[in-house]
Amino acid sequence: MKPYVLKFQEIRPHSEALVGGKGMNLGACSNIEGVHVPAGFCLTTEAYKRTLAENNEFTQLLQRLSSLKTSDMDAIREISETIRTLIQHTQIPSEIASYMDATLLDVGGYEMPFAVRSSATAEDLPHASFAGQHDTYLNIIGKDALLQHISMCWASLFTERAIIYRIQNQFDHRKVQLAVVIQQMISPEASGILFTADPITSNRKSLSIDASFGLGEALVSGLVSADSYTVRENTITNKIIATKKLAIYSLKEGGTETRILEKSQQTKQTLTDQQIIQLAKLGRKIEAYFGKPQDIEWCLAEGAFYIVQSRPITTLYPIPEVNEPGNRVYISVAHQQMMTDAMKPLGLSFYLMTTPATMYTAGGRLFVDITQSLSAKVSRDMMVNSLGQSDPLIKDALLTVINKKGFLPPLPTEENPSHATVSGKPPVRSIPDSSSVFELVRNSENSIKHLKQSIETKSGSDLFDFIVEDLEELKRVLFNPTSIDAIMAGMDASAWLNEHIYQWLGEKNVADKLSESAPNNITSQMGLELLDVADVIRPYPAVRAYLEQTKNPDFMNELATLEGGAETKKALEDYLQKYGMRCAGEIDLTKTRWIENPLTLIPLILSNIKNFDSGASMHKFAQGEKEAFHKEQEILRRLQELPDGEQKAMETKEKIDILRHFIGYREYPKYGMINRYFIYKLALLRAGEQLVKDGILQEQEDIYFLYFEELREVVRTGQVDYELINVRKRDFATFEKLTPPRILTSDGEMINGEYKRENLPKDAILGLPVSSGTVEGRARVILDMEKADLEDGDILVTAYTDPSWTPAFVSIKGLVTEVGGLMTHGAVIAREYGLPAVVGVENATTIIKDGQQIRINGTEGYIEILD
């Protein structure tokens, strides 16, 4: 017999598909000792399906909905209204009504007032915060009224808002069903919401309570302001008493009314201090039962607290699991690497196996525990100053943690002996020989060539042994002392030039102009060479027309039928042979590479054809060289006019030569690493394909949700835990929606820092200046490079840019990113291309709207919206 009705105490764990998120959580709360839940039951999804199962019109309407996009508003509106009317006029089968009759007798009978709440299978789940998307009805009395409101709850599954939300979150309308919670109404003196973690800072030790008089609907619907109480370790740390002009109360005959409160009550504290602590303890008990922070709806009646809902807080950033005592401080690796997307487990594995630093995972990102470095003055000062140079927001976030009273242990009165020899100054590095860049590149290319040949013969467990060995070769290449010296030589020369030329001539960031068209930069070459691909295609209108409309991932093979198709295919293949291992978010080995989906490059190629004349790559590079040379001559001439000018000019010339020789090499080690990652990926996908053939894996790309050693064990044993893979897929869907903080504490507090600058234009949007100059233009807010339809002279506004974005830089005249630092990829390439750039602009992609006219000041570090 199918369970159409379940009392709360009868609901078992993992029953989302039967009772929805709300129903399952109420069932769990009903089983917690000392927690009062108003009596009630759940009309299950089986009742929903039974009522509508044989309705052909309903089935056809669902089929129509499944093909719609969020842009199809007229169709959504029409189908929404039709479905809701249909459901409300469909009679609930008598057998379901009979089960309800019997259950209602146990929870008070039809004469009792009830709350009728929808409980969707896609609502209140850990990976999708659907709260408030479906309807709730209060103080419903009588059988007919209950049945009517049950149908109205079912119909609320198909409001326009709910339909659009499902489309956005890729939920299948045909698979989402609705259960209905029917619960005794409490007529409370007060009600509200309790968060067992601070919803603003994510601090897990701070508990937040919102409270107002009457029913909670006034608070949830935004009709009234609420008192706000903060509790930490059973101590009230903050109280804000709101003016509560209104409250909603139940009516005896059913329904609710809104009342204006007496003046004396409007400013009265809703809960006493004793009640606040009592409720906080109750919240901690519920949190402990579920094992994660909770968003709890509560009400107070006759001196007792009742819980009417509890759901996980879906917006909190996870905390790294570190078995170390005391308070800890973690710094985001994502912000240093300019890639803040969530990574899949296999991608995390390879980065962890590549880096010598100890890192921890949280929310699909990597963090480093810097607590020890902050516990001694010398290492603390070095960290704050070095990181602060490249990213002032991280510096401010670190200072915020350091200044948190009692969070970090006090500095020792005498320095730790292990730090005694540290001067606080960066070590003096030797400048490599001028031929070293050529040798480093050649050695890396030879090493990659050997890897490609050797890995082809490896399979099974031997493949994993081979990859582990080759990762040591990768680390040898990446952390070669000569390579590091070459990178630092360019960076040190840049810093020296900026500091001394500002001191001597009063000119800021002169290294930006001097870096334009520097040689040996594999990433800027990548952008310019895509212009050469555009030159090959430009004379062939049939190819251009085909590329403008094709969505076929196999388009390369179709080119052969077109005039110029063979030439186009060869140009693309040559480009992909050199750069095809790159993509957005490329440090995650699991990301789709350009060579795996060449369609990604087509919008940029078409933009290049539209925006540039033939030969633009040579012209742009030569123009950059010319401007850098003229700036060099100007600086040297002005220096020679100063006291001791010949000496200053000689020193400056030496630094300019070092800058131009070495600054481009900085991009090469990552290019080599990504090359290797792609070779590993292809080999592991072959292993995944074999696992699918052997019936062990369902899909080849399921390997992405296993860590390297786990995948190695699956290959060795032929056994896999699919529940683990499915959990990680759900977790990843959650992690994708989270924004990682720059600094995270062991309390879960997210600290992102603030800019502290004065004398800027009113309403200026602050960021970090990384490439000098001021420019005005149309903002193009682009989050996906595949949609980069850029016009010559646009200003690119995006979340971050890694090397894969470089081809877009040839079309733009300015850059704004949410993440970045002085020496991160976007900054380096912007300087080489001569583009004014401001990075580290918090929420830039939401504050700035696509198409707005903006002005960016890459010298002072701010943006102005002009319209």
Swiss-Prot record:
Changing R311A: Strong decrease in RIF-phosphorylation activity. It is an enzyme of class 2 (transferase). Residues 767-865 are annotated as: Swivel phosphohistidine. Its EC number is 2.7.9.6. SUPFAM superfamilies: Glutathione synthetase ATP-binding domain-like (SSF56059), Phosphohistidine domain (SSF52009). Residues 327-754 are annotated as: Rifampicin-binding. Changing Q309A: Strong decrease in RIF-phosphorylation activity. Changing K670A: Loss of RIF-phosphorylation activity. Changing V333W: Almost abolishes RIF-phosphorylation activity. The keyword Iron does not apply. One of its GO terms (molecular function) is ATP binding. Keywords: Antibiotic resistance, ATP-binding, Kinase, Nucleotide-binding, Transferase. Residues 1-314 are annotated as: ATP-binding. ATP binds at K22, R117, G132, T136, Q183, E297, Q309, R311. Transmembrane segments: none annotated. Changing G527S: Almost abolishes RIF-phosphorylation activity. Changing Q183A: Slight decrease in RIF-phosphorylation activity. Changing T136V: Retains ATP pyrophosphatase activity in vitro but cannot phosphorylate RIF. Rifampicin binds at Q336, Y351. NCBIfam families: PRK06241.1-2, PRK06241.1-3, PRK06241.1-4, RIF_Ptrans_rph. Catalyzes the phosphorylation of rifampicin, also known as rifampin (RIF), leading to its inactivation. Confers high level resistance to a variety of clinically used rifamycin antibiotics. Does not show phosphoenolpyruvate (PEP) synthase activity. Belongs to the rifampicin phosphotransferase family. Contains three domains: an N-terminal ATP-binding domain, a large central rifampicin (RIF)-binding domain and a small C-terminal swivel phosphohistidine domain that harbors the conserved histidine residue essential for phosphate transfer. RIF modification involves a two-stage mechanism: the first reaction, which takes place in the ATP-binding domain, involves attack of the ATP by His-825 of the swivel phosphohistidine domain, forming a pyrophosphorylated histidine residue. This reaction is followed by transit of the swivel phosphohistidine domain to the RIF-binding domain. This is Rifampicin phosphotransferase. The gene is rph.
